[in-house]
């Protein structure tokens, strides 16, 4: 850790401590300090965990609240300091002229150059390029806008402080530093007096607003900038023949993901689509307003094109002061039309004033883009390239990137629900009496007949359906209306979770047809929505390629795919596959499924786009996105990748413009490299695959013996983690399980992983791997040879390296001594001790095997930056966990007061902040 980072953390921590003493009193401050220092002693091995338990012995809920808040704020400020440090390191490397680091576009251009990648290969990859970060809701990402604003201001002031500290001192340096410190103290005081979390359970609308906040914080500016920069670089390096469509195309699930969430309705789809459109249209209006002020160029000084003059004449801005300023008059007219468009699409209440009413709304984003390009062309013709390359170029890129929709809203529902809806519709329409009970072949016959027929399935004016069916129909109806209003890019994807058959994929197509998103035309349907199977369980992942092979033999579906650019998108579920089979088995099942899909698509002549349903944690497919994309099989990326982003991961990646740029670059860089370069050095692919398959089977056996076969496991899990509290407190809008059940299978992935993260076991990120590796390696001479094989794979194969690195990262955040405190909450001591012993033994065996294969002495030897980050977080995490255990104990004994409930929620959010990838 550099002096600069250490100084920042101490500086911010000291101010926070002084604010706590001032606001809460000396007693609270001293208890915070005692807990912090005790945590440091535990981290250094100079004290036992019981010493921290004793610090909080008998603590009242009222006194626990400021302590939980204190350590949550410490974590928040430490994150801020680390982000600044990462930013500083990047700037220093650039200033020093160092070789660009991996995951940057500069490094990617060098690699493409060294690999002699030609323009034709680049053009082929970019023709259907799509790098899509898809924002999803998360129960612990409930920070309020006020908190984000405070963080933003503190970050700004810290940058000012750094600039002064690194500059040559002057007579005013100290007074300026004092003023900056005063500003930071003011912001931290405001932060301390602001509630970190909401009182009420967040509504879907709240989660939609949280997602939109990141566009305002960074993505509205940074997505157009990176798309523009990539286009410029590609044109310069590979010529005009390379397609220059926007590469980054954002998406969202918030408001459209109704899988297991009864609160997603037609109203939330409408809210999500309208607020997204309103956000981007108002962004355009602001940019045009600025351009109108900036483009004061006079036609007395330079020439303009006839097209620009025509645009200026249509601008209704003939005031004398602007008679010779055609650009201002042109932009004024364009702004008027965008405001008129906003009024038409969103409502007149969304626009101030009435002056825009003389303008005609734009019929499409393309019409708006043409006007912007008219201005751009005129500037370039008159040699004003520098001016064109500024704000206007970002605006043009924004129009190409966002259209009038901002993001693509995905619809997602599970296959069982679609089947239930169609069963009711078919029965009511007298198509078939009990569709659900038909064989697969019989279902297929019914579905194809319906998809070929233009006849409506729902009689006009009919609304006598069950509540569930009515809700589903409302969602599709509203999605169709949004597409008509904002264009086909608004709702271009329909995802079927738990897809396990051909008919699972065809069923939602009937609903899409019913509401005009697919037009029936015999065996040649037309439509604007990609139908995407989501393979989630180990079994479904293994069967996925076979399902698609059968699907593509159906002329109707194959023709539909052809008119969708011949692209088949497939979503892979990291979360449920992990819950189903454990960390290693899930990772191998996913990789093996991709191998099969790549080969199938190659032989069938279909383009493959993979959508990775990754969570923040390693247990849900998390880890560095750059490494994860490079770890995909050759041919699995092909210029396109979609990835879910959620929770603390969103705030960590996109909370400010600098980190947003860095993370967007990482996604684009990895996509280009994985598509155009061979990043694997494997010499015997089949041997590597056989090894993974054998280890996977052993890992699955160990995992299943605990999670699926141990009779006491469910009790251990539900009673030693905050699962019950996640379900009962106001944490997220979605229920914690798909059904009212206590089985692992029906739990949603986020509560499953979040619960293990909070209790610091992190079980989904490693359990079963140690036993599998030990058993596969064996003993004697065979062991020596097999260890060498695994070491070679670790050095030459990004997939295996990524699996081990991600596992080490999550294991470094586990703390089995804390896990024992959670286990002590279980009434049945026999179950508690037995299951805890199994977990503890497997943890240390897994750590041992990791060190054997990597040649390391510890988990993070090869990642000192992350190791120091984990060490810095340790003192903030321990007090939060100890307080959480005490509050859970009270809650379960019947003290479900608001104070106790709030403390549990505070500690959950604090731990999620400190861990930075908790669920």
Swiss-Prot record:
It comes from the Bacteria. Its cofactor is Mg(2+). One of its GO terms (cellular component) is cytosol. The active site is at residues 138, 579. It catalyses: oxaloacetate + phosphate = phosphoenolpyruvate + hydrogencarbonate. Keywords: Carbon dioxide fixation, Lyase, Magnesium. NCBIfam families: PRK00009.1 (NF000584). HAMAP family: PEPcase_type1. This is Phosphoenolpyruvate carboxylase.
